[in-house]
From Swiss-Prot:
<dbReference type="InterPro" id="IPR017871">
    <property type="entry name" value="ABC_transporter-like_CS"/>
</dbReference>
<dbReference type="InterPro" id="IPR003439">
    <property type="entry name" value="ABC_transporter-like_ATP-bd"/>
</dbReference>
<dbReference type="GO" id="GO:0005524">
    <property type="term" value="F:ATP binding"/>
</dbReference>
<comment type="similarity">
    <text>Belongs to the ABC transporter superfamily. Aliphatic sulfonates importer (TC 3.A.1.17.2) family.</text>
</comment>
<dbReference type="InterPro" id="IPR050166">
    <property type="entry name" value="ABC_transporter_ATP-bind"/>
</dbReference>
<keyword id="KW-0067">ATP-binding</keyword>
<dbReference type="GO" id="GO:0005886">
    <property type="term" value="C:plasma membrane"/>
</dbReference>
<keyword id="KW-0813">Transport</keyword>
<dbReference type="InterPro" id="IPR003593">
    <property type="entry name" value="AAA+_ATPase"/>
</dbReference>
<comment type="subunit">
    <text>The complex is composed of two ATP-binding proteins (SsuB), two transmembrane proteins (SsuC) and a solute-binding protein (SsuA).</text>
</comment>
<dbReference type="Pfam" id="PF00005">
    <property type="entry name" value="ABC_tran"/>
</dbReference>
<feature type="binding site">
    <location>
        <begin position="106"/>
        <end position="113"/>
    </location>
    <ligand>
        <name>ATP</name>
    </ligand>
</feature>
<protein>
    <recommendedName>
        <fullName>Aliphatic sulfonates import ATP-binding protein SsuB</fullName>
        <ecNumber>7.6.2.14</ecNumber>
    </recommendedName>
</protein>
<keyword id="KW-1278">Translocase</keyword>
<feature type="domain" description="ABC transporter">
    <location>
        <begin position="74"/>
        <end position="293"/>
    </location>
</feature>
<dbReference type="GO" id="GO:0016887">
    <property type="term" value="F:ATP hydrolysis activity"/>
</dbReference>
<feature type="region of interest" description="Disordered">
    <location>
        <begin position="48"/>
        <end position="71"/>
    </location>
</feature>
Amino acid sequence: MTGTSLAATYGPIAGADLEAELAQPRTADGDAQDAAVLERDGGAHALPFASGGAFGRAPRDDDDDRRGAGDASVRLTRVSKRYGERTVLADVDLAIERGGFVSIVGRSGCGKSTLLRLVAELETPSAGTLVKRGDGGGVLDTRIMYQDARLLPWKTVLQNVMLGLGRRAKDDARAVLDEVGLLARAHDWPAQLSGGQRQRVALARALVHRPQLLLLDEPLGALDALTRIEMHELIERLWREHRFTALLVTHDVQEAVSLADRILLIEAGRIAFDQPVPLERPRARASAAFAELEDRVLQRVLTGSDPAGATSAAASAGGAARGRAAQANGLRWAV
């Protein structure tokens, strides 16, 4: 099956050509050669679910009641993924509320990115059911952003954002570049941009389609600390303005607490920890409540046990939390 026929069947996903994605091994992001394939097949592709709305079986009317998910835009029911004899994900049950922001953390190799690729439908489950529903029950327009911006080096910033949209989309592309603070760089080349600016272009390229679901696969992992904070603020602002559903895979626990309403920990291919984030926005990183929640999640990742038990991490913001703040800020990476 060619990239053209795949696009006709499934529609586009930004930042990833389907033929290249399905053929490549599960390793690092693509480079300019992948970007050339992307341009060849008409730009960034979207990947909504198939017409039935689900992998494995048709969705049932009682799915919402059985899962207790309410208005879920994405639902996985007993989903497993195997590569040969190796099981990467096992019996995953997950419902993502429409308009929510969910972060997935865990050690390297635990299955985080595999779960994201299943939701993107770049891979299919070995067992179980994945259901995606857009507004009104229609197609859930999905875009994905990687750590590698995958910009075409021979096209300007504006042209990169317009990939696959045609000349009539110039006004939309300029508007979204203005939203990410790069309208003044519209006619620059990607090589003239910093790493953070390149990621802003990648974000603009995804958001120009006004997606209902944005998937973020460690998009800020290569950026310096200050640029990461600026990108956190930008992503949160755009999420609040456009109210898309967001699913973030990250190694950085502080990043997960900064952005998400809910944090999932994957261990040995299963969801081992599901933590709400009851902190007001914008998040106060220097607060005791933030530090306590960050420390709780981090310790759960590192030790495999919940130091706070069933008690909400943000319920108490006393002296113990202040004592752990320096530790939480100094050790943020769950790798």
